[in-house]
Amino acid sequence: MVIGILGVQGAVREHQEMLHLLGVKTMIVKSSADLDGIDGLIFPGGESTTIRRLIDRYGLLDVLRRQADTLPMFGTCAGMILLASELTEGPSHLGAIPMTVRRNAFGRQIDSFETSLNVEGAGQDIEAVFIRAPFVEQVGEGVRVLAAIGIAAVVVETDLHLACSFHPELTSDRRLHDYFIQKIRRRTAVSV
């Protein structure tokens, strides 16, 4: 198995290290050719506007939108914003997950926090680092909420994709990455 990590900006190295600890090969994706032969793709946390500009500069937007129909994707923090079909302010990016996301929903940088979450299917007390984090205000058809803080959904999935508001790659807790790996394996087993 090879999982790609969008390598234009953000916590790329941290995701790569997490996947290596789980025994998974990685590919840093900076061009459409880098998408060949990967089994899944992670959109790391970072600054969503900057990531979008770089996606456009590298000519990746259209190919990523097409890949979103068949390639499992996992978005963390800014990656969740990129995968959303709708944002409360501004245009959407990839539209891979039918959900409405609010950027910086928990406040500014100074309001960043850490907590533990119970994530359905992935485990109890999962470490979660929230930095200028978004949350999901509304989910569409086929989207399951796996964890929430109050009424704010912070981990969601579809049959194909996974997204979270926080940075699991900035902790030592590998369970959310492992959940994504198992999601890919289940999909691969079904399609064989």
Swiss-Prot record:
<dbReference type="GO" id="GO:0004359">
    <property type="term" value="F:glutaminase activity"/>
</dbReference>
<protein>
    <recommendedName>
        <fullName>Pyridoxal 5'-phosphate synthase subunit PdxT</fullName>
        <ecNumber>4.3.3.6</ecNumber>
        <ecNumber>3.5.1.2</ecNumber>
    </recommendedName>
</protein>
<dbReference type="GO" id="GO:0042823">
    <property type="term" value="P:pyridoxal phosphate biosynthetic process"/>
</dbReference>
<dbReference type="GO" id="GO:1903600">
    <property type="term" value="C:glutaminase complex"/>
</dbReference>
<feature type="active site" description="Nucleophile">
    <location>
        <position position="77"/>
    </location>
</feature>
<comment type="pathway">
    <text>Cofactor biosynthesis; pyridoxal 5'-phosphate biosynthesis.</text>
</comment>
<feature type="binding site">
    <location>
        <begin position="131"/>
        <end position="132"/>
    </location>
    <ligand>
        <name>L-glutamine</name>
    </ligand>
</feature>
<dbReference type="GO" id="GO:0036381">
    <property type="term" value="F:pyridoxal 5'-phosphate synthase (glutamine hydrolysing) activity"/>
</dbReference>
<keyword id="KW-0315">Glutamine amidotransferase</keyword>
<dbReference type="GO" id="GO:0006543">
    <property type="term" value="P:glutamine catabolic process"/>
</dbReference>
<dbReference type="InterPro" id="IPR002161">
    <property type="entry name" value="PdxT/SNO"/>
</dbReference>
<feature type="binding site">
    <location>
        <begin position="46"/>
        <end position="48"/>
    </location>
    <ligand>
        <name>L-glutamine</name>
    </ligand>
</feature>
<comment type="function">
    <text>Catalyzes the hydrolysis of glutamine to glutamate and ammonia as part of the biosynthesis of pyridoxal 5'-phosphate. The resulting ammonia molecule is channeled to the active site of PdxS.</text>
</comment>
<keyword id="KW-0663">Pyridoxal phosphate</keyword>
<feature type="active site" description="Charge relay system">
    <location>
        <position position="169"/>
    </location>
</feature>
<dbReference type="InterPro" id="IPR021196">
    <property type="entry name" value="PdxT/SNO_CS"/>
</dbReference>
<keyword id="KW-0378">Hydrolase</keyword>
<dbReference type="InterPro" id="IPR029062">
    <property type="entry name" value="Class_I_gatase-like"/>
</dbReference>
<keyword id="KW-0456">Lyase</keyword>
<dbReference type="Pfam" id="PF01174">
    <property type="entry name" value="SNO"/>
</dbReference>
<feature type="active site" description="Charge relay system">
    <location>
        <position position="167"/>
    </location>
</feature>
<feature type="binding site">
    <location>
        <position position="103"/>
    </location>
    <ligand>
        <name>L-glutamine</name>
    </ligand>
</feature>
<dbReference type="GO" id="GO:0005829">
    <property type="term" value="C:cytosol"/>
</dbReference>
<comment type="subunit">
    <text>In the presence of PdxS, forms a dodecamer of heterodimers. Only shows activity in the heterodimer.</text>
</comment>
<comment type="similarity">
    <text>Belongs to the glutaminase PdxT/SNO family.</text>
</comment>
<dbReference type="GO" id="GO:0008614">
    <property type="term" value="P:pyridoxine metabolic process"/>
</dbReference>
